[in-house]
From Swiss-Prot:
GO-annotated cellular components: extracellular exosome
Additional remark text: Corresponds to the light chain of other gamma-glutamyltransferase family members. Has no catalytic activity.
Pfam families in the record: G_glu_transpept
Taxonomic superkingdom: Eukaryota
Active site as annotated: 37
InterPro entries given in the database record: GGT_CS (IPR055262), GGT_lsub_C (IPR043138), GGT_peptidase (IPR000101), GGT_ssub (IPR043137), Ntn_hydrolases_N (IPR029055)
Name of the featured protein: Glutathione hydrolase light chain 2
Length: 218
């Protein structure tokens, strides 16, 4: 999945002027969205960086807690596929994601650290909103707070619907529809991004207001 050949195959399927039906992309798996997830981004004085995401998967995980520690148990096994069983998100089973010893399930979590050719970190950000925040910051020149707060869109192929946040620019929605996207307004926010960016004056951090929380530094 990290090879240049695989990336080139995916890139060749992208059309600037139109979207395509699901069969065009020849999908072999689908990635569900996690519900009970938190992310932490940290950069130390010496430039050491940590991007860590933790999850119990669905909201309230398995809805079972330990009677001793009162820790809530996760239901991460639902991220695996099982033959003839459709998961919590309505995603049909995928052979590539079947349960096997020593295997991790597919996940929409995407902790990321980006560095330039000289090893200096230009930025870092999460799944669909992660590349959007990176594009806003690196390509469009938005500061980290604006990049994190910009309205988002999401398409996970199945269902083949492009979900947009309620406050997105209508011109964006119109442009998507001219490319044959079926759009709908998200009932809530689309994921959450926490980001730290190296600037000319030092470091800038942003905590997504979609989920509360604040950046902190010393």
């Amino acid at each position: 999945m990290t090879s240049e050949f695989f990336a080139a195959q995916l890139r060749a399927q992208i059309s600037d002027d139109t979207t395509h039906p699901i069969s065009y992309y020849k999908p072999e798996f689908y990635t569900p969205v996690d519900g009970g997830t938190a992310h932490l981004s940290v950069v130390a004085e010496d430039g050491s960086a940590v991007s860590a995401t933790s999850t119990i998967n669905l909201y309230f995980g398995s809805k079972v807690r330990s009677p001793v520690s009162e820790i809530l148990f996760n239901d991460e096994m639902d991220d695996f596929s099982s033959p003839n069983i459709t998961n919590e998100f309505g995603v049909p089973p995928s052979p590539a994601n079947f349960i096997q010893p020593g295997k991790q399930p597919l996940s929409s979590m995407c902790p990321t650290i980006m560095v330039g050719q000289d090893g200096q970190p230009p930025s870092h950000a999460d799944h669909t909103p992660m590349p959007q925040a990176i594009i806003y910051n690196l390509w469009f020149g938005y500061d980290v707070k604006r990049a994190v707060e910009e309205p988002r869109l999401h398409n996970q192929l199945l269902p083949n619907v492009t979900t947009v946040e309620r406050n997105i620019d209508q011109a964006v929605t119109a442009a998507l529809e001219t490319r044959h996207h079926h759009t709908q307004i998200a009932s809530t926010f689309i994921a959450v991004v926490q980001a730290i960016v190296r600037t000319a004056g030092g470091w800038a951090a942003a905590s997504d207001s979609r989920k509360g929380g604040e950046p902190a530094g010393y």
